[in-house]
UniProtKB/Swiss-Prot annotation:
Gene3D superfamilies linked to this entry: Leucine Aminopeptidase, subunit E, domain 1, Zn peptidases
A Pfam short name: Peptidase_M17_N
Catalytic activity: Release of an N-terminal amino acid, Xaa-|-Yaa-, in which Xaa is preferably Leu, but may be other amino acids including Pro although not Arg or Lys, and Yaa may be Pro. Amino acid amides and methyl esters are also readily hydrolyzed, but rates on arylamides are exceedingly low; Release of an N-terminal amino acid, preferentially leucine, but not glutamic or aspartic acids
Cellular compartments annotated: Cytoplasm
The protein, known as: Probable cytosol aminopeptidase
Upper classification of the organism: Bacteria, Bacillati, Actinomycetota, Actinomycetes, Micrococcales
Keyword Electron transport: no
PROSITE patterns: CYTOSOL_AP (PS00631)
Enzyme class: hydrolase
UniProt keyword terms in alphabetical order: Aminopeptidase, Cytoplasm, Hydrolase, Manganese, Metal-binding, Protease
Provenance organism: Leifsonia xyli subsp. xyli (strain CTCB07)
GO cellular component annotations of the record: cytoplasm
Function: Presumably involved in the processing and regular turnover of intracellular proteins. Catalyzes the removal of unsubstituted N-terminal amino acids from various peptides.
Length: 496
């Protein structure tokens, strides 16, 4: 989709010639409505009270504007003035004002951080996906095309550039996830990556099925061998000369997950095009780092396969040899994400980056435990703390989970180094997946007792699917969860 134009303006527009709607912020308490934005017209608080405005999150009230001026909209804001309050309020307003061409936001910003969050939230709220609509396209309101934010900053250009880049990254994830698996499969995904990278200072390397076999990527090959559309591994590298640290990102990219021979029920297959969200997120984060010219090396590994049943599909009890030689007995072909990630994690570790973060819609257990707003994170304590801090700063919800080493025996194999699942076990499925992945994290040096490379695993299965009802800047459909946190983490790694 085409992103909105963003700009800063020193004062709120007074004419409908420059803006169609002016958005203000307000809240309410026991004493009534409190308008937070400066310059509001006299009596506005009473008008809001008369129409039942409560100041809650996701609340937007539209009122007539002054004669000759833009219409007025008032969005609910909490009393807290953290960055996320501005991001959320701006996104709420812009999302709900779809169908309006030009919007100006005059929220009570006082700092560059609040101003940047307002720009970001507004841009995130201006998303729609209509590529596959024909007869019904006219019924979908166009997102806001022009966004002005009232505020001044010496860093205005940088704030606008960052907000636009973050919103473009989230939009890319949503576009990729929204695409049907008929059109987005491993080969076309790889082609899309090459096209996206063409004008950026990044390199792209693609492993087809022949090269995957030659280089020992048995997990990706095994998962993909049941499909008529063969798998791919895509490596995206942004490596500026100024970089002193290296962040590796590994994404699960199952373009459609039928479950393989361990077939899902029909209802369980609906939405399984979302199973490549992790790969889309790490791709978008790497491209964003390049657009922002961050002084940090970012390598994204996209592990792409389609998990389908056929006469050539892997079977329960088959043994796969992962890159590096470790063997895995497949006891559940629907626990395929960890198999492709294992290859990606080993490959990422061979370069000995400063940290590895993998992102995957990995387990239904994560959604059962944490619902559809929170993603899980587990791994090395210090890196997990860094990832959580990046998520908090970017307005994403992560919850730390333990790496339960005592569960390792649960996925022991009678014939291989490890099993990918324990079909009779119903407890701790999310934790078991993390314990499995930990087996494939490399060491930071040649010695066998060298410490393992810091690693964090994000299980985004719950929030990736998006809400059944929109909220904030997030509409129905894919949420682009984790991409903003990954961009912030790359910024933190760069020292910017």
């Amino acid at each position: 989709m085409t992103p909105p134009s963003l700009s800063l303006t020193a004062s709120a527009p007074s004419s409908s010639a420059s803006s169609d709607v002016l958005v203000l912020g307000a809240r309410s308490d026991d004493e009534g409505v409190i308008v937070l934005s400066a310059g509001a017209r006299d009596g506005l608080a009473a008008e809001l009270a008369a129409v039942g405005f409560s100041g809650g999150k996701d609340e937007l009230v539209r009122l007539p504007g002054a004669e000759g001026g833009p219409a007025l909209a008032v969005v609910g804001m909490p009393d807290e003035r953290d960055e996320d309050a501005f991001r959320y309020a701006a996104g709420t307003a812009v999302r709900q004002l779809a169908g309006v061409q030009r919007v100006a936001l005059a929220l009570p910003t006082e700092t560059d951080a609040q101003l940047g969050a307002t720009l970001e939230g507004a841009a995130l709220g201006a998303y729609a996906f209509t590529e596959y609509r024909e007869k019904t396209k006219a019924g979908v309101k166009e997102p806001v095309a022009e966004i002005q934010v009232v505020g001044r900053s010496d860093e205005g250009d940088a704030l606008i550039a960052r907000a636009a880049t973050v919103a473009e990254a989230a939009g890319l994830v949503k576009d990729l996830v929204n695409a049907p698996p008929l059109d987005l499969y491993p080969a076309t995904f790889a082609e899309r990556v090459e096209a996206l990278a063409a004008d950026l200072p990044v390199s792209v390397e693609v492993w087809d099925e022949t090269r995957l076999a030659a280089d020992g990527f048995g997990g990706i090959l095994g998962v993909g061998q049941g499909s008529a559309r063969p798998p791919r591994l895509v490596k995206v590298v942004y490596s500026p000369d100024s970089a002193t640290r290296h962040l590796a990102l590994v994404g699960k990219g199952i373009t459609f997950d039928s479950g393989g021979l361990s077939l899902k029920p029909a209802s369980g297959m609906v939405g399984m095009k979302y199973d490549m969200t992790g790969a889309a997120a790490v791709l978008a984060a790497a491209l964003a780092a390049a657009k922002l010219r961050l002084p940090v090396r970012v390598t994204a590994w996209l592990c792409l396969a389609e998990n389908m049943p056929s006469g050539s599909a892997i079977r329960p009890n088959d043994v796969l040899r992962i890159r590096g030689g470790r063997t895995v007995e497949v006891l559940n072909t629907d626990a395929e994400g960890r198999l492709v990630l294992a290859d990606g994690l080993v490959a990422a570790g061979e370069e000995r980056p400063d940290a590895i973060v993998d992102v995957a819609t990995l387990t239904g257990a994560a959604e059962v435990a944490l619902g559809t707003r929170y993603a899980a994170v587990m791994g090395s304590d210090d890196l997990v703390a860094d990832v959580i801090a990046a998520a908090k700063a970017s307005g994403e919800l992560l919850w730390p989970m333990p790496l339960a080493g005592e569960l390792r025996a649960t996925i022991a194999s009678d014939v291989a180094d490890i099993a990918n699942a324990n079909p009779g076990n119903t407890a701790g499925g999310m934790l078991l997946a993390g314990v499995f992945l930990q087996e494939f994290i490399g060491r930071s040096g040649d010695a066998e007792d060298s410490p393992r490379i810091p690693w964090a695993h994000l299980d985004i299965a719950g929030p990736a699917k998006g809400p059944s009802a929109p909220y904030g800047f997030t509409g129905k459909g894919p949420s682009a969860v984790s991409v903003r946190a990954l961009i912030r983490l790359a910024e933190d790694f760069s020292g910017r």
